[in-house]
């Protein structure tokens, strides 16, 4: 894929977020823009999900030493500059609450509107408990309907953790 072609659909760092993210995030996003590589391409090379790889860029997902080696090669940056990715993430601080970015706000709105419905259905199916966001994976897929309209499919898969009686 040419760098010019890749730039049109390439996720980049919103400069207003930069100060809230780890310093390595700027290195990652700059290298991503320079190489024109997508999260999908990186995920295939790392054997991880696109969301996990993107999460590394935002300081929300910990990278393994193997991830750092592969990212270093893919993004053409030193392994040393990516070493902070192996530290424990400081999760949950990337943006304001409630979110102000429109797409992220829509996800927040889904939980506001359907959160209790999700909870009720899960309780009926599994009992009293919660869905783990630790023993968890997620993916984003694109579907196109019969009329040619694009649809987003977000899968959230978490281990069910029943509350214990005490």
Swiss-Prot record:
The active site is at residues 106, 109, 132. Its EC number is 4.2.1.104. SUPFAM superfamilies: Cyanase C-terminal domain, lambda repressor-like DNA-binding domains. GO terms for biological process: cyanate metabolic process. It comes from the Eukaryota. InterPro entries: Cro/C1-type_HTH, Cyanase, Cyanate_lyase_C, Cyanate_lyase_C_sf, Lambda_DNA-bd_dom_sf. One of its GO terms (molecular function) is cyanate hydratase activity. Keywords: Lyase. SMART domains: Cyanate_lyase. It catalyses: cyanate + hydrogencarbonate + 3 H(+) = NH4(+) + 2 CO2. Catalyzes the reaction of cyanate with bicarbonate to produce ammonia and carbon dioxide. Belongs to the cyanase family. This is Cyanate hydratase. It comes from Verticillium alfalfae (strain VaMs.102 / ATCC MYA-4576 / FGSC 10136). The gene is CYN1.
